[in-house]
Amino acid sequence: MIFKAFDLERLLSDWEQTVEFNFAESGVHPVPLKELLEFADADLNEFLDIPLNYPEVNGDLKLRQRIQELYNGAGLDNVIVTVGASEANYILANTLLMEGDEVAVMGPTYMQFSGAASNLGAKVKTFSLNENKAWALDIEELQEAVTPNTKVIAVVNPNNPTGKILSEKEMDVLITAAEKVNAWLIADEVYGGAEREKTQPTSSFYGKYNKVITVNGLSKAYGLPGLRIGWIVAPVNLIQELWKRHEYTTVSSSMLGNRLGEMALRPHVRRQLLDRTRKLVGQGFDVLQQILDEYGSGIQITQVQTQKADPPDQVIDAFR
């Protein structure tokens, strides 16, 4: 089987470090180490004596405790730390899927999980966020994409690249669709906290269904991509299976990444990081709007975060 390249990531890798203006960037300007330490009221010297050893393979205990606190009902054994959300998605695909399995992926989206699934020989189907309806979930396409053979339904919420935030009813539709066919639902939630028009992160899928898997990390909403810290929160028995693949891929993330990641998730530091991100997103949006007003003839912005097109209750019932 020919292993397909991740063309989007290769394109970004070729150019993102050399161009002057990068309109393909999906994060905010990264946080300098000095600023992170200032947010935490920490001294650099406390890190100079850290032995550069391996951390715990499933993630430093204190870091996993910080992650656990973000998810109602989660315990330490529900958490595994990965090298960014990218490793999380990769080991999920390799754990849950085999050749011939069906996967339903919400689009448009960052194509890493669907690419990994394709490379395993899985059949990838897509269902859309409808551009003509302010990127509302396309219920008809979802019904067509999800079958009794569907092993995984994968979504990104808040969505990359549209910025769409699923409403509670849209989330309910997805949960109901997964329950009906006993599929896993993977929710990549790395943009939760980067919302321009909200002061609280988007609610998580975690806990809404016993086969929900959430993926997150410090790269996007936190502005800390260089730490390469991601995580998966999932049922304990699945975490044990993911651990096996984790040991074959990266073994662990870095010791410094774990220590600084724990610092970033301390409540008062986390709040400052997310405030910083929202400020940058708001300022950037205003600049973009000014540029388009002046030069962007024929280009318009759909402010999807503020628009709702909830499916009626009878649509939800149709999946039951």
Walk through the language-model features, giving the residues of each:
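N-terminal small-domain helix-loop-helix segment of the aminotransferase-like
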Residues: 2-84, 91, 265-267
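Elongated, amphipathic alpha-helices that form coiled-coils and helical stalk/scaffold elements used
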Residues: 283, 289-320
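Active-site phosphate-binding strand-loop segment of PLP-dependent enzymes
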Residues: 131-200
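A short helix->loop->beta-strand "cap" motif at the edges of active sites that frequently abuts
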Residues: 101, 122, 180-183, 210
